[in-house]
Amino acid sequence: MNLIISTMLLILTNQYSIETPNYKLVKKYKNFEIRDYEEMIVAHTKIKRTFRESNSTGFRRIANYIFGGNDKSMEIAMTAPVLTKFPSDINSNIFEVSFVMPKEHNLKSLPSPDLETVSISERQLGRVAVFKFGGWATENRTKYYIDQLINSLKKERIDAVGDIMVAQYNSPWVMPPFRKNEIIIAIK
């Protein structure tokens, strides 16, 4: 029993020690919050598959990059969250998976990826609405929470204007009750 409790505490404390992007909390609503994100650098890749397959393939491609699959064989610290951008065309199935690079790096200090399918670029999320949820971020659950956030924005007369992403903060072995995910939508 002590081993189980110790393991759970280790998992929970580890998930909060991973670097995450900086943002300013603008306003908190009942079901969501508004944030202003600072510019960040991301490693990203596009995948034309299902949501689940895209997350898996995208994760592996970028993990290859940060674990030394680059022109300097340099290892780069893992950060959170892993971002999956939904296709802007509802009939498309091209997802973009991104890892945020540690703040200590800039575009010049980061090595070039070995894989041509991985790119490094600056990303400006800007002002976004964020809806938090736990459990597994499956495609059905994610779409459900996207709808929840869009409906909440409409009630508050806030216009969604850009990309829709799901942010997953935890490693795969974190149990569903302890998982942290967010739906992120760019707003005016």
Regions found by a protein language model. Name each.
Residues 2-188:
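A solvent-exposed interaction/effector surface
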